Amino acid sequence: MLSKIELMLLRSLETGKTYTPEEAAELSGLSKDAVLKAAYMLQERGYVRVIENVRTHYSLTEEGERYLKEGLPEEKLYSLVKSGVNSMDELRKRMGREFQIALGWLRRKGAVEVEGDKVVPKREPSFDERAALQAIKEGRGVDEGTLKTLMKRKLVTKSETKQVYIEVMKKPEIELEDIITDLTPEMLLEGTWRGKQFLKYDITIPAKEIYGGKIHPYERIIEECRKVFLEMGFTEIKGHYVQPAFWNFDALFQPQDHPARDMQDTFYLDRYIDLEGEIVERVKATHENGWITGSTGWGGEWSLEKARQLVLRTHTTAITIHYLAENPEPPQKAFCIDRVYRRETIDATHLPEFDQLEGVVLDRDVGFKHLLGLLKEFFTKMGFEDVRFRPGYFPYTEPSVEPEVYVEGLGWVELGGAGVFRKEVTEPLGIRGKVLAWGLGIGRLAMLKIGLKDLRRLYLPDLGWLRSMPVARK
């Protein structure tokens, strides 16, 4: 017994001929998806044969195109060596990062040898790879060994396309059966569905994928963090990306010669802001001699000029400490989720800009155990069952801890820093009470939740990966 779409497809096609889904759709009046659906059902009945041809295509990568145009690194290096430029230092200077690549390939070919600090030519090499790049660009074939080498060097990429053909094998003597394809609300209300025959659906048949809009997985995790703290009674605060070094460092009792304040760690602007007032004088005195905090301070002379310089904030603590200075009376519960900037070398776990979750609790009767309980509750709500705390050190908190969560396959992973603000931080700003504070890297948390090994993946426009991400996570 054939369904309506099977019958429509068979009636429109000729026995013994082969059609593409597009051709069959035009002849039958069905959509391409309906044609494929009917074809796979008819194949099971032996009326048609669905032929799937997979075509492999090779193309040059951006680097492959450049090497084809400018020459392979080993070609350039051999040309220099042959012309008399043999010094390793000079060759590195001329070729940059391509020097090691080129030297490695020339040594494999037996074309050069390294003698001391010199590269010496031995025999004329062949550069078949460049000819192969040209052949691939023109759509011609190359031998498998060369192809593997080019793909290993990431000069060539492989892609596959699938073409489906429908061949009609035979046609039965058939009549249109009264098979219902749609169950309507009216049929359910009136009960007319009883005794009817409904079309069976094969859920394994390929169909066109539909990609609906959804929130980016990283943005969703940020929103989860925000929701947790709002549910815990916190107020969300915001602040400027550009801050005076005073609020980013000095107000947090970070010494002016601290390594974190070096040019290689912080983005400094060539601009300054006016600073004056009682708070500035108190912070100055605290750094120099401890003021009235009971501390001896850092000693030396505190520089107002350094404190006046603007920086791209290195942590959102600059926002929370400023908030507490403006709201010094307890109780206060605030958090900030925002972007921060540091002069980091980009790799799988570091970026020069990233998101940080910062929070503070100001009250008279809170202590270290409350901080641990609060952080444990947050991580539990975020889906981490095993949480522990390791002693840490930060210039502006004492005691200090680093929270860690256990992840299957990775072990214990550190996710930030926390502690109780020192008196050298709170008293100069007029803050009345104890302050629990923490700063967590959301990027690393997101990597664990999503299962990524490379932080950069969160920011790449990889539609394939984004489409594969589920709308909801466990």
UniProtKB/Swiss-Prot annotation:
Principal localization reads cytoplasm
Could you tell me which species this protein originates from? Archaeoglobus fulgidus (strain ATCC 49558 / DSM 4304 / JCM 9628 / NBRC 100126 / VC-16)
Residues reported to bind Mg(2+): E398
One GO MF term on file is: ATP binding
**Quaternary form?**
Tetramer of two alpha and two beta subunits.
**Which HAMAP family would you find in this protein's record?**
Phe_tRNA_synth_alpha2
Name of the protein in question: Phenylalanine--tRNA ligase alpha subunit
In terms of superkingdom, the source organism counts as Archaea
Q: Which UniProt keywords apply?
A: Aminoacyl-tRNA synthetase, ATP-binding, Cytoplasm, Ligase, Magnesium, Metal-binding, Nucleotide-binding, Protein biosynthesis
Q: Which InterPro entries match?
A: aa-tRNA-synth_II, aa-tRNA-synth_II/BPL/LPL, Phe-tRNA-synth_IIc_asu, Phe_tRNA_ligase_alpha_bac/arc, Phenylalanyl-tRNA_Synthase, WH_DNA-bd_sf
Q: Which reaction does it catalyse?
A: tRNA(Phe) + L-phenylalanine + ATP = L-phenylalanyl-tRNA(Phe) + AMP + diphosphate + H(+)
What the entry lists under Pfam families is as follows: tRNA-synt_2d
Q: Which Gene3D superfamilies match?
A: 1.10.10.2320, 1.10.10.2330, 3.30.1370.240, Bira Bifunctional Protein, Domain 2
PANTHER family (UniProt xref): PHENYLALANINE--TRNA LIGASE ALPHA SUBUNIT, PHENYLALANYL-TRNA SYNTHETASE
**For binding L-phenylalanine, which residues are annotated in this chain's numbering?**
T317, Q356, L357, E358, Y396, F421
The record, for NCBIfam families, names: pheS, PRK04172.1
- Cellular component GO terms, alphabetical: cytoplasm
What is written in the cofactor note of this entry? Binds 2 magnesium ions per tetramer.
Q: Which EC number(s) are documented for this chain?
A: 6.1.1.20
Q: Where is this protein localized, as stated in its record?
A: Cytoplasm
Biological process according to GO: phenylalanyl-tRNA aminoacylation
Identify which top EC class this enzyme belongs to: ligase
Cofactor(s) demanded: Mg(2+)
